[in-house]
UniProtKB/Swiss-Prot annotation:
Keywords: ATP-binding, Chaperone, Metal-binding, Nucleotide-binding, Zinc
Organism: Afipia carboxidovorans (strain ATCC 49405 / DSM 1227 / KCTC 32145 / OM5)
Gene Ontology MF, one: ATP hydrolysis activity
Protein name (Swiss-Prot/TrEMBL): ATP-dependent Clp protease ATP-binding subunit ClpX
Entry's Gene Ontology BP terms: cell division; proteolysis involved in protein catabolic process
UniProt cross-references to HAMAP family, sorted A to Z: ClpX
SUPFAM superfamilies found in the cross-reference section: Glucocorticoid receptor-like (DNA-binding domain), P-loop containing nucleoside triphosphate hydrolases
InterPro entries, per the entry: AAA+_ATPase, ATP-dep_Clp_protease_ClpX, ATPase_AAA_core, Clp_ATPase_C, Clp_protease_ATP-bd_su_ClpX, ClpX_bact, P-loop_NTPase, Znf_CppX_C4
Domain ClpX-type ZB positions: 3-56
Gene of this entry: clpX
GO annotation, cellular component aspect: HslUV protease complex
């Protein structure tokens, strides 16, 4: 509390946090030695609400229920209901296993590692990133394409455990209860059906190296990372209770699945097979372990991923939602960029549909939406800083289809992009 020593303001009270006087705020709340204004109270409440949003509501046992986990995933990821259910149940059971082992020793609950299979741009990595945001156990993501067998140039598989250890602030006990997501797992498939042709240090060799840490072993991890040497001290991390989630696009797997069960015959009685016209995500639903073996995963590796969740192709409606609904939606990002030029950016509903259809044609999923928007808005973003009086830019379906230019709306007239100098 502070007072001004002159005039009538001698006894004026001030907020101890923001310094505003009692005349500048609606309410000033007094404590034993401090004062706080209503504005600071509201700010504190906003901070608390934001923190509560990012934390899961716990059930009676202190374990987030699958529905609670799925509800948070729904706020960030559009569609993929089945994959969300699988992940929610797996994470819920992971929590239960950890609690069970601290209370009982009669029945040992084995972990169920997860394999996520879905077309590129369907949301596999985003699901994992969202889990990392909402969980209260250590979480790390690794890229399988950077891994090699021990002794070769590249990252050892123990580096994955090191990243988890770093996420747990080098608390070994917390790291041993964490979750690891390995992306691009399909890129370490065996390069040949014949395992004895040559040494495959970045494919089958990595699968062999991952087997033990996924099953459960005590890994020796160098605290500073890098290669191991005899004089180095190691941290011992038990991976038995670490949940592993692997994800990959598995390009070409749909052909293996489609060909399974088809009988080839010749002659007049031969059956004529129509070409597969289903979408990739629909075909992935029928995946079997034998299909993964043909793709190039070794049997032991497939056996350590008992739970398989497939993701669907994103349809036009889902892609339109992705463009506008999430908190950091692409359209919102570009609208913010245009706001910096004091210009409003508007997309017609038909334009959003055209963008979604383009992404489907390119088979890039949600990942390709940004490149499409970038190409549509490139010329406008180039011209806009040099133009005066533009209040709004409207993107129509014709603009997306490259048959028209964006519409510029000025304070006193409308004009077409690129024609402003001619009519000025």
């Amino acid at each position: 509390m502070s007072k001004v020593g002159t005039g009538d303001s001698k006894n004026t009270l001030y907020c101890s946090f923001c310094g505003k006087s009692q005349h500048e705020v609606r309410k000033l709340i007094a404590g034993p030695t401090v004062f706080i204004c209503d504005e600071c109270v509201e700010l504190c409440m906003d901070i608390i609400r934001e923190e509560n949003k990012s934390s899961l509501v716990k059930s009676r046992d202190g374990i987030p229920t699958p529905k609670e986990i799925c509800k948070v995933l729904d706020d960030y990821v559009i569609g993929q209901a089945h994959a969300k259910k699988v992940l929610s149940v797996a994470v819920h059971n992971h929590y239960k296993r950890l609690n069970h082992q601290t209370k009982h020793n009669d029945v040992e609950l084995a972990k169920s590692n997860i394999l996520l299979i879905g077309p590129t741009g369907s949301g596999k990595t985003l699901l994992a990133q969202t889990l990392a945001r909402i969980l209260d156990v250590p979480f790390t993501m690794a890229d399988a394409t950077t891994l090699t067998e021990a002794g070769y140039v590249g990252e050892d598989v123990e580096n994955i455990i090191l990243k988890l250890l770093q996420a747990a602030d080098y608390n070994v006990e917390r790291a041993q209860r964490g979750i690891v997501y390995i992306d691009e797992i399909d890129k370490i498939s065996r390069k040949s059906d014949n395992p004895s042709i040559t040494r495959d240090v970045s494919g089958e060799g990595v699968q062999q190296a991952l087997l033990k840490i996924m099953e459960g072993t005590v890994a020796s991890v160098p605290p500073q990372g890098g290669r191991k040497h005899p004089q180095q001290e190691f941290l011992q991390v038990d991976t038995t209770n670490i949940l592993f989630i692997c994800g990959g696009a598995f390009a070409g797997l749909e052909k293996i699945i489609s060909s399974r069960g088809r009988t080839t015959s010749i002659g007049f009685a031969a059956s004529v097979l129509a070409p597969e016209d289903r979408r990739t995500g629909e075909i992935f639903r029928e995946v079997e372990p034998e299909d993964l073996l043909k793709y190039g995963l070794i049997p032991e590796f497939v056996g350590r991923l008992p739970v398989v969740a497939t993701l669907e192709d994103l349809d036009e409606a889902s892609l339109k939602k992705i463009l506008v609904e999430p908190k950091n939606a692409l359209v919102k990002q570009y609208q913010r960029l245009f706001e910096m030029e004091n210009v409003e950016l508007t997309f017609a509903d038909e334009a959003l549909g055209a963008v979604a259809r383009k992404a489907i044609e390119r088979k890039t999923g949600a990942r390709g939406l940004r490149s499409i928007l970038e190409s549509i808005l490139l010329e406008t973003m180039f011209d806009l800083p040099g133009l005066e009086g533009v209040e709004e830019v409207v993107i129509s379906r014709e603009v997306v289809e490259a048959t028209a230019r964006p519409l510029y709306i000025y304070a006193d007239r409308t004009d077409r992009a690129g024609e402003s100098s001619a009519s000025a």
